[in-house]
Curated annotation (Swiss-Prot):
The lineage of its organism: Bacteria, Pseudomonadati, Pseudomonadota, Gammaproteobacteria, Vibrionales. One of its GO terms (molecular function) is copper ion binding. This is PF03932 family protein CutC. It comes from Vibrio vulnificus (strain CMCP6). Coiled coil: none annotated. Belongs to the CutC family. Its main location: cytoplasm. Gene3D superfamilies: Copper homeostasis (CutC) domain.
Length: 250
């Protein structure tokens, strides 16, 4: 039995690290600290040229909830076109109504657009903020998505194992349930064996110091507690050890 290990990244250095670690698919984002936003066209284009595995672009125009305005929805459609033009293989999005249900009408428009461009579709962790997950599961299957990225509605996938197990059973292989949030080499084998998921998602996040020799300590480019001279990156060994842990149970 083979497992898929999807790695979410938000910079080109992390792409190299994820591939070296054995990632089988990439979720391309910007701003992972905000949960992942749409990557730039330049990032998508270069990643497509460099990658040896499929890349799915996050389509999320802002941080926060998944209730989008008409303008934001228009941006999402344009960004799906950009992902195809950049040479990517798929897109990742999720839309909810104000009542916490899947926004079926708008999701259908995006799925049909993606499919018309030969792009695969993942419904992301907006699913974890819906009020009726099993009804939402059926809707997402009917809409034609390939997979759902979910923590089992919990703070992390290990904490959501019970719901993940139920989702796998209910899906009956009509789409993939991909476990994400808090996945690590330490817990991934148990997570897969317990729930039956065949796909996992992680960032393998780490940091490295800036290569700047001059450190401007008084100015900040963002929040006061943000260190501009610490660079977040994917840790190659974390990805490699996750892959090896899954191979040990295959």
């Amino acid at each position: 039995m083979s497992y898929q290990v999807e790695v979410c990244i938000d910079n080109i250095e992390s792409l190299h690290n994820a591939l070296e670690g054995g990632a089988t698919r990439i979720e391309l984002c910007s701003s992972l600290a905000l949960g992942g936003l749409t990557p730039s066209y330049g990032f998508m284009t270069l990643a497509a040229k460099l990658s040896t595995v499929p890349i799915y672009a996050m389509i999320r125009p802002r941080q926060g909830d998944f209730l989008y305005s008409d303008d934001e929805f228009a941006i999402m459609q344009q960004d799906i076109l950009s992902a195809q033009q950049a040479g990517l293989q798929g897109v990742v999005f999720g839309l909810l109504t104000a009542d916490g249900d899947i926004d079926v009408a708008r999701t259908r428009i995006l799925v049909e657009l993606a499919h018309s461009l030969q792009l695969g579709v993942t419904f992301h962790r907006a699913f974890d903020q819906c009020r009726e997950p099993f009804a939402a599961l059926e809707q997402i299957i009917d809409l034609g998505c390939e997979r759902i990225l979910t923590s089992g509605l919990a703070a992390s996938a290990p904490l959501g194992k019970e719901i993940l197990t139920q989702l796998v059973a209910h899906s009956q292989s009509r789409l993939a349930i991909m476990a994400g949030a808090g996945v690590s080499p330490v817990n991934v084998a148990d997570l897969a064996l317990t729930t039956g998921v065949k796909e996992v998602h992680l960032s393998g996040k780490s940091t490295r110091p800036s290569k700047m020799t001059f450190i401007a300590s008084d100015s900040k480019m963002g929040a006061a507690d943000q260190d501009d001279f610490i660079i977040p990156i994917t840790h190659t060994a974390t990805i490699r050890n996750t892959v090896l842990a899954l191979k040990s149970i295959s």
